[in-house]
Every structure is written in C-alpha cells, then in structure tokens.
A protein has these predicted regions:
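N-terminal secretory signal peptides that target proteins for export/translocation
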Residues: 1-13
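Bacterial N-terminal signal peptides
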Residues: 19-29
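Short coil-to-helix leader/linker segments, especially the first N-terminal amphipathic alpha-helix
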Residues: 21, 62-64, 148-151, 304-315
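Acidic, metal/ion-coordinating pockets
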Residues: 33-290, 297, 337
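Short sequence/structural segments immediately N-terminal
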Residues: 44-52, 278, 283-435
Length: 435
C-alpha cells in the first residue's frame, strides 16, 4: 500500500509541475501592448524675450536658457518629441531687437525645433534676416513670399514617431493680421481653402494619422478650423492684448491650445495612442522659473547676444558723450522741497532699482536701462554709471520729466510765473509706468 501511495503522490507532483510550466510559458509568450506616449512641446508669441527681466519674482519667467533645459530633460525620458513654435518670435524693429531676432533664429536651430510658423511681427526686419539665419523649417502653408529662399520654407511637415504614427504639421497665417501690418509683398491665401487642399492631398497619399494645425490668427478664426472633422490639434500663436491667457479646449479626442506670452511657459501636449490613433490627449504649461538651471546648449549664442548688446550700448554712449546737456536735477534737488514724497520714494523699489541690473550684469542693456534709470536716451539723462552716477535708479524725474525748468521757476520770486510750474510736468497715469 505504501508503494502505491508513493507512486500516486509522485504522479500528482509531476502533473502539477507540468501544468505550472505550461501556464508560465503562456504568460511569457503573451505580448504586452503598451500605449505609445507622444509629446508635443510648443512656444509662440515670445516677442524677442531672450532672457526674462527678472526684476520681480512674477516677471522672472522664460528665456531660451531655461527653455532649452526643459527640452533636453523631456528628450532624455521620451524620444517621441515634436517641437514647434506658433509665430511672433520677434517684436518691434529696433537695433537691439534685431540682435534678439538673430539669437532666436539660431536658438530654434540649436534646440532642434521641427517647425516654426511666421507671425505678422516676424516680417518686421524683412526677409534678409530669415534668409541669413540657420533655421530652415519655416512652415508656411498658405503664404507665398518670393523674397524668402525656397529652401528655408516648407508647405507642411511630417513627423514620424517610433511607433509609426505620423503627425502632419500645417502652418496657417491669418490674412487679416498680415494685411493690417501692410505686408503687401506677401501673398496670403485663405487659410480654410488652403487647408482643404492640403488635407485632400494627405488623405489621397495616406501620409498622416494625426492632423496638427499651427495657426497664427484671431482666436475665433482658429476655432473654425478646429471644428473641422479632419483636424485633431490646433496650436494658436496669436494673442489678443486684452486676453493674454486663453484656456485650452478639449472636444472628445481633439484639443485646441493657445501659447503663453513671451515664452514664460513651455506648452506640453501629451498623447497616448493605440493603432496610431489618439486615445487620450492633455495639455499643461511648464513655468520656466528660476528653479530651472541654464542650459549649456544655447549658452554660447546667449553670450554672443550679450556681447553684441554691450557693443551697441558703447557705440550709443560714444555718440551721446559729444553733446551732454544738464536738464535733470536729480533726487537731491527734489528732496529740498518735497521731503514727504521723497521719504515714501526712498522706501520703494524705485530708489534702488539699479542694483538688480548690477546683480544680473545688465548695466549695459538698453532695454533694461530705460526702466531702471532716470532719463535714459533723453537729453541730459542717464548715460552710464560712471558718467552720470547721480541718475541711476527710478527717480522723481523718471516719471515727472526733467526738472531744470521747474527749478528755474521755483528760484524766481514771481507768482505769475510760479503758476506755470504744474504745466511743465506731464499728467501721470498708469501708462506712465509702462515701458
């Protein structure tokens, strides 16, 4: 009996082992299908902000050095990255603005942007700066400009990800914006009509799984394109000055987003796909704050921009030194009669505003000096710390205007003339504080 029991137990163990082995083998051979994660990083309406002002915490956002750091970080954890810009990279035409424009174009190339749309402000320096720049992925689907080199522009861009999913990027500029700027040399086709032609071509060729529109137009016009059945994603780069923050709109598995002003945030759209189709889609804005380290990837072009800005300032300084006029009387003179107001000013950030420029090594930057000194680029106003040391900081005359004539009337003993004192100063409003 014992012998039979032993054999029976042995068979039982062998059977259990065989069943376990078969089940384990099946588990190993079952393929696991994980959803592919696709990331779209985007900017737009940067308006030449190479580096943030940083005077206050709320303004210390943005800049190409921090942006490049986040882009590098995203690429280190996900190879499925699409990097785009939706236009208005430049601002108003100035000498320093042109240096910024060149830096921005080089930044697109260094950071590896896949495509960028031109906004209406990006034509302020003409086509020469675009033709000379190193970036050659300007996506202009509905724009014809014979002055732009053909190799610099593309009609649409196809991004093929590791899982085989293809996103078609189409760049559409609003006709009303360019016509308002008087860009008569540039021909802009109706965005809707042009889009229809491209979609027909893409459908016939079966080239794309996801349709993404980079738009630079009024919000409502972009919304009309977003509502089309074949459009999956819209990134709009034009911001209305009265509505700088526009929330994303999600409709099913479609999304429409708007950029954040001056490159202070990096937009990030996350997409999960199955069989090359969108399953889930979401958006977030990554704040480019002071916690983010500067990237070495674009440090060299930023340093070059800084050097050229300093040269620009020194050239202006040499020209200005030839004709110095004394029209500003400085805070010391104001204090004699306006002690109460002076005491309030002395406790304010205005009284030591120049320190922040020294801290960030920006005492030569014209765009910073106009807000941190008194009378910069005005007759008799601030020139440099060494030449006009008494005009550093935002003094009384920075807002009220030069006080030399005011002082002359005060020194005279004529009541009739003293009545004119108030006329000499401009009325101060909120606009007086804006650069």
């Amino acid at each position: 009996m014992n012998k039979l029991n032993i054999n029976s137990s042995s068979k039982k163990y062998r059977t259990s082992f065989l069943v376990a082995f078969i089940l384990f083998s099946c588990l190993i051979s079952i393929p696991v299908f994980a959803e592919e994660s696709l990331i779209i990083l985007y900017t737009g309406s940067v308006l030449g902000e190479v580096k943030p002002c940083g005077c206050t915490e709320e303004e210390d956002l943005g800049g190409i050095l921090r942006r490049a750091t986040i882009i590098e970080k995203e690429r280190s954890v996900n190879k499925n990255i699409l990097l785009l810009d939706a236009g208005d990279t430049f601002k108003e035409p100035t000498e320093q603005g042109k240096l910024k424009a060149k830096t921005m174009i080089e930044g697109f190339n260094k950071m590896g942007y896949d495509a960028a749309l031109l906004g209406e402000k990006d034509f302020v320096y003409g086509e020469e700066i675009l033709n000379q720049g190193s970036f050659d992925h300007w996506v202009l689907s509905n724009v014809e400009n014979n002055n732009l080199k053909q190799e610099k522009t593309i009609k649409y861009f196809l991004k093929i990800f590791n899982n085989g999913t293809t996103i078609a990027v189409i760049g559409l500029l609003g006709q009303e914006l360019l016509f308002a700027k008087g860009q008569t040399k540039v021909k802009v086709e109706n965005p809707g009509i042009r889009l229809e032609k491209i979609l027909r071509k893409l459908k016939a060729a079966g080239e794309a799984n996801i349709i993404l529109l980079l738009t630079h137009m009024d919000k409502e016009k972009a919304k009309e394109l977003f509502n089309l059945d074949d459009v999956d994603i819209v990134i709009n780069g034009h911001l209305d000055e009265t509505e700088l923050i526009v929330n994303p709109e999600i409709a099913g598995k479609k999304i429409m987003v708007h950029v954040r002003e001056r490159g202070q945030y990096l937009g990030k759209i996350s997409i999960s796909t199955d069989q090359k189709k969108i399953q889930n889609i979401s958006n977030e804005y990554i704040p480019l704050n002071s916690k983010i380290n500067d990237s070495q990837l674009v440090q060299s072009i930023y340093d070059k921009y800084n050097d050229e800005t300093k040269q620009l300032f020194m050239k202006w300084l040499q020209d200005k030194k030839r004709a110095i006029k004394k029209t500003f009387i400085t805070e010391i003179a104001c204090k004699m009669c306006h002690r109460y107001e002076y005491a309030i000013w002395k406790k304010s950030g205005h009284s030591h505003s120049f320190k922040s420029l020294k801290k960030s090594n920006k005492t030569f930057d014209p765009e910073c000096l106009k807000c941190h000194t008194t009378g910069f680029k005005q007759d008799g106003g601030f020139m440099s710390e060494s030449i006009t040391p008494k005009l550093i900081n935002v003094q009384c005359e920075a807002c009220h205007g030069a006080g030399s004539n005011h002082m002359k009337f005060i020194m005279r003993d004529h009541k009739a003339e003293q009545k004119k004192i108030n006329i000499l100063y401009k009325k101060l409003t909120e606009d007086s504080c804006l650069p």
